[in-house]
């Protein structure tokens, strides 16, 4: 990290040595004793994430790196968004206009979470329409079907610990 020091313009031209200051002069005593990061999100397929370029080798390296830095929990931020889904979920393929995914990322993520002894939480599907249109029950019903399907297909994984509710509400959300 670079620390900006107040130096005269003349001294600043010579760099830190001219100021007689270094980053160490400003470091806090507990710099390496912050609250550890133990969990992270996995962004599955959507929006602006170039996930399609990663295969199991890249994901394995990522999970290994996460484990090595102390992460013990991964959360699939959502099962899909709009037309993009993280696995071939039959309930979504039958009822929504979604693309058939080329890879079962959920199986891959759970297998890697098992391998590295991590807890895995599954995020819900975001249709990109029902929630925004105020059709909350439709989004909920869709996800209830998804939960049943996901548990039947993936519930045997030791790492599978539960669910993450990705839909958000605020004080501005009407008719909730």
Regions found by a protein language model. Give the residues of each.
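Short, well-ordered coil/turn segments that N-cap beta-strands
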Residues: 33-38, 70-72, 116-120, 156-161
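Active-site groove signature of glycoside hydrolases
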Residues: 125-131, 146-175
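Boundary/entry segment of secreted carbohydrate-active catalytic domains
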Residues: 19-72, 77
